[in-house]
């Protein structure tokens, strides 16, 4: 590569580092062009998969302020630059590596920190953002229903207590009226006898 081409390539890779939320560094030795195309499709629109020269990638990472990745830039290197949620792209890379032993995940970075292979795999094992949000919403909905039940419980208990007291008074009032009627009838009967 001529010097101007190298400068342009470094600038492009630097922009990819700066514009991505995460990156996963891989070794692609033994993958065919068809395999790489399949991997790019699996990554989707939120990630790009680029093959690059190690010296240029090292320089671009340094210019982007990313440290701790130099040891990963050995051998045939390709980088998945992730612009959206890193979980889906990491999951796609991990699944592709299971099916294609030629793809080796070396590590990566996220939020400015270097990631080991184990950390990339842990990210891949997480559930997607949408699923986690759905679970959170479900948990919140259940808790809100419980809270509403707790807030409504004292009011319904008071209503049941008031209804029970009213029934009790009605029953006592009916019992109190019956002896009074009997008492008023007794003198009338007494007059009739006399």
From Swiss-Prot:
Biased composition range(s): Low complexity: 172-187
Alphabetical list of InterPro entries matching this protein: Ribosomal_uL10, Ribosomal_uL10-like_sf, Ribosomal_uL10_bac, Ribosomal_uL10_bac_type, Ribosomal_uL10_CS_bac
GO MF assignments: large ribosomal subunit rRNA binding; structural constituent of ribosome
Keyword Transferase: no
Protein name (Swiss-Prot/TrEMBL): Large ribosomal subunit protein uL10
Family affiliation: Belongs to the universal ribosomal protein uL10 family.
Coiled-coil positions: none
Function in brief: Forms part of the ribosomal stalk, playing a central role in the interaction of the ribosome with GTP-bound translation factors.
Gene Ontology process terms (BP): translation
Record field: transmembrane: none
Keyword line: Ribonucleoprotein, Ribosomal protein, RNA-binding, rRNA-binding
Region ranges (Disordered): 172-194
A Pfam family it matches: Ribosomal_L10
Subunit (UniProt): Part of the ribosomal stalk of the 50S ribosomal subunit. The N-terminus interacts with L11 and the large rRNA to form the base of the stalk. The C-terminus forms an elongated spine to which L12 dimers bind in a sequential fashion forming a multimeric L10(L12)X complex.
Keyword Ribosomal protein: yes
Recorded superkingdom: Bacteria
Alphabetical list of NCBIfam families matching this protein: PRK00099.1-1 (NF000955)
One Gene Ontology term, aspect cellular component: large ribosomal subunit
């Amino acid at each position: 590569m001529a010097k101007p081409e190298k400068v342009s390539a470094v600038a492009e890779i630097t922009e990819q580092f700066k514009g991505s939320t995460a990156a996963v560094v891989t070794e692609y030795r033994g993958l065919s062009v068809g395999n790489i195309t399949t991997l790019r499709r699996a990554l989707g629109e939120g990630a790009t998969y680029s093959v690059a020269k190690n010296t240029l990638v090292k320089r671009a990472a340094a210019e982007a302020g990313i440290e701790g990745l130099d040891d990963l830039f050995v051998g045939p290197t390709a980088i998945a630059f992730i612009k959206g949620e890193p979980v889906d792209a990491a999951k796609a890379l991990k699944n592709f590596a299971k099916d294609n032993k030629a793809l080796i995940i070396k590590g990566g970075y996220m939020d400015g920190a270097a990631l080991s292979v184990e950390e990339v795999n842990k990210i891949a094992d997480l559930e997607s953002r949408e699923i986690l949000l759905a679970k959170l919403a479900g948990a919140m909905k259940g808790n809100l229903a419980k809270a509403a039940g707790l807030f409504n419980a004292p009011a319904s208990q008071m209503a049941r207590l008031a209804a029970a007291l009213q029934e009790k008074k009605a029953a006592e009032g009916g019992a109190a009226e019956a002896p009074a009627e009997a008492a008023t009838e007794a003198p009338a009967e007494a007059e009739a006898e006399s």
